[in-house]
């Protein structure tokens, strides 16, 4: 297996609402399925695709039970400066997110905070001085 992550699918309660939230953050819808039986939204990001799909349908498709609780996964959005962490957290709050942890210095020498999207998915917004966020959005380990 080649080392690669192609798609992250978030199970959501209301795909239209979740889509509107990510569009309010500046993400651009790249496609999807929208018919009488299903609604899936796809956003192209550098190096991977983010999908939004009904939580129950995703659980069924994955062969697991939807417990509605935290699944032990946190998403991360790396930025170029500590100031950008605070700006992104403010943008997320304005779009409808809850701030779980405001921006603060970390034990590993960076600066990060966490917002929770409307469906309960935690997003860490982080500046790591040892990583590079390139102009095309890729993040690399230095």
Could you describe each region identified by the protein language model?
Residues 4-13, 41-43, 63-142:
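Vicinal oxygen chelate
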Residues 18, 22, 85, 92:
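Hydrophobic pocket/interface hotspot
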Residues 9-59:
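Core segments of cupin and vicinal oxygen chelate
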Residues 1-19, 74-77, 129-142:
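N-terminal beta-strand motif that seeds the catalytic metal site of vicinal oxygen chelate
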Residues 56-68, 132-134:
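Short, flexible, glycine-rich and Lys/Arg-enriched loop motifs at helix boundaries
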Residues 2, 31-42, 106-113:
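Generic detector of contiguous secondary-structure segments
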């Amino acid at each position: 297996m080649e080392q690669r992550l192609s798609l992250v699918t978030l199970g959501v309660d209301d795909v239209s609402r979740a889509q509107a939230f990510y569009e309010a953050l500046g993400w651009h819808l790249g496609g999807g399925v929208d018919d009488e039986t299903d609604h899936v939204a796809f956003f192209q990001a550098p190096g991977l695709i983010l999908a939004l799909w009904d939580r129950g349908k995703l659980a069924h498709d994955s062969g697991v039970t939807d417990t509605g609780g935290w699944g032990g996964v946190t998403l991360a959005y790396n930025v170029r400066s500590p100031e950008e962490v605070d700006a992104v957290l403010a943008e997320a709050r304005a779009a409808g997110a809850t701030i779980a942890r405001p921006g603060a210095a970390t034990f590993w020498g960076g600066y990060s905070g966490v917002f929770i999207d409307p469906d309960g998915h935690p997003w860490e917004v982080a500046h790591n001085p040892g990583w590079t966020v390139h102009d095309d959005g890729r993040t690399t380990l230095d």
